[in-house]
Regions:
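Hydrophobic ligand-binding cavity/cleft-lining segments
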Residues: 1-49, 149
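Exposed loop/turn and edge beta-strand positions of beta-sandwich/beta-sheet ligand-binding modules
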Residues: 9, 70, 97
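Generic structural detector for well-ordered beta-strands
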Residues: 12-16, 43, 60, 75, ...
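Residues that form or flank phosphate/diphosphate-binding pockets in enzymes
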Residues: 17, 52, 67, 95-98, ...
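Amphipathic alpha-helical protein-protein interaction surfaces
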Residues: 18, 28-31, 81, 108, ...
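Short, solvent-exposed helix-to-loop capping segments enriched in aromatics
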Residues: 24-37, 54-66, 138
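Glycine-rich portal/gate segments that line the openings of hydrophobic small-molecule binding cavities
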Residues: 43-94, 106-111, 145-157
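Beta-strand/loop substructures that line and gate deep hydrophobic ligand-binding cavities in soluble
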Residues: 88-145, 150
Length: 157
């Protein structure tokens, strides 16, 4: 991995549910603890009370499901009901990691793709050398878990 490359990955799961129903679950960040293996709660910040471009929320993370535990501040970067929802994990005023959900009608249901993109940074190459490649694999596995948990809820009714 070069220093100017991003680390990224994605997972897709088909859900026998409408895109609007899936989007409503995903875009309500209060639900994140029900689905994510690492983020166990989230709350809107400031005047934000729901999904909107530029809205901020805080996510409470238990890294690798065991720790360390920390808060992240996130900003909504994509918000189109029934189609996409995305947010950036902020490091100060800079997006460090971007998470995105894209919903596409398919076979009477919805294909839901979750992706992440860790922004290029000088430290990323060093991180990769010291095990960052394992993080990519972990993220893809956790995105698949997250999507399957969402699938279980939307298909149950």
């Amino acid at each position: 991995m070069c220093l100017d490359q991003a680390m990224e990955g994605s997972a897709t799961v088909h859900m026998a549910a409408s895109a609007d129903k899936v989007w409503d679950l995903i875009a309500n960040v209060g639900n994140i603890g029900r689905f994510s293996p690492e983020v166990f709660e989230a709350e809107w910040l400031g005047d934000a009370s729901g999904p909107a471009l530029g809205a901020k929320f805080r996510g409470h993370v238990r890294r690798n499901e065991i720790g360390p535990v920390y808060w992240t501040t996130c900003e909504v970067t994509a918000c189109e009901p029934g189609r996409e929802f995305g947010f950036a994990v902020m490091l100060g005023d800079r997006a460090a990691n971007n998470w995105h959900y894209r919903l596409a009608p398919s076979d009477g249901g919805t294909d839901v793709t979750e992706s992440f993109r860790l922004s290029p940074a000088p430290w990323l190459g060093v991180y990769w050398l010291f095990g960052g490649f394992l993080r990519k694999r972990r993220n893809v596995r956790d995105m698949t878990k997250t999507l399957n948990r969402i699938k279980d809820v939307v298909e149950a009714g």
